Amino acid sequence: MKMTRRDFLNVSTAAAVVCAATLLPVEKAAAAQQTLAAQNLLEQAYLYAFPLVIMDATRTASTNTRTATSNKAPINQFIHAEKLADATTRAVVTPNVDTIYTQAFLDVGAEPMIYGVPQTDRFFNVQVLDAWTNTAAVLETPGLYAITRADWQGELPEGVQRIDVPTTMVWTIARIVLSGQEDLPNVRAIQDKMQLMPLSAYQAGGWTAPTGSYDPANDFVPVKHVLAMDAKEFFDAANQLMETNPPAAADAPVLRELAALHVGLGEKFDDKALGLFSGLRWKLMLLQLKKKLQSESERYTRQMGQWIYFGDPIGNFGTAYTYRTMVALRGLGANTTDVAIYPKTDVDSTGTVLTGKKTYTLHIEADPPTLEKGFWSVTAYGENDFLIENPIDRYCVNDRSGLHRNPDGSIDITLSKEAPADTTNWLPVGEGDFHLFLRIYKPDAAALTEWQPPVVRAN
């Protein structure tokens, strides 16, 4: 997928020769404008469809198994994680060490799926995402829910609450907070009480989960798999997925434009629509994508002292298509800001990059304001966005860590590679540069405006 210097020179030279040989100056300008318009439309189509295609690739990889395991399960079955992330975890970047996940990819095309949320004594919620990575619902109250395609017509049993999703493909992510490894048995007991089965099986009084299937070709990393697709493979997949996962009504204006490329519901993609040098044009677009996404992300960045985080409309993107793709690339399945925010900092109070060559104090004047069952944590990551190996296997500090507090209730956390004399309030870091994520679940939005964010100072 990488464009070589030779590729770039070839496309540039070929285009120049054609223009010089056949076009007058005015015609050259018109041709250049036409080429730019075609390139912009191609980029627009890719940014629009990417979340749908990456969601399906994630579903394919996550359900590629005959039986349920701790990281895969057949369609309509739970994937119960069994342990917290550590320094060896490489499945995702910036892994969370506050919660255990239970996920499931659902197909609600034939009938609703019944989802049972158990009674718990802790933070527990279920994010329900549609195929376009939007949050359709968040389930928190114990009870039975019918996750249903919005156009389904039928009767539900008494006491079962209907949850409409506009697409056939659904991804559910349950997050269960825990206090550490010793709390895992309690989390597993909660997982055992969760229920998932088709409506017909629920009405029949029980269900034996069917055996899935395994294909070695589907053992891929979803992001790498999608980024390696050529134009035809990508847009063929997008068009096919739209048949069962229709675009939102608000997408009509952009789809009218994308019809010129034969991208959309009912369309059949033809790469001839990309014109001359379509393959190289595709590669060039992918090379320029990172810059485009970085620029777009800055529009949605929110400042919190020396920390920044991504704000609304994260998790429910509407027509913010570029933002939606940026989030899908960086962290598929992002929460809405009423559920959680993730402020990040990679600098100290003077704006200097954080490094393991120094020792710092993270001063928390007051705990982040949260609603009932909310919680907070601070996690350190290395330059590669993974957890940092350390002698005490500590990757974060949080409101469950038993931290020593100052007489005024504030907290001082030592950030360093070498252990201090008292390690109670120590968050280990590595030798190189590092950054911190402050996770706040169920934030009190009103109180956050007056809350003083933590400050990192070099000692």
Q: Could you tell me what each predicted segment is?
A:
Residues 2-7, 16-33:
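N-terminal twin-arginine translocation
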Residues 32-459:
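A compositional/structural signature for long, glycine/proline-rich flexible linkers
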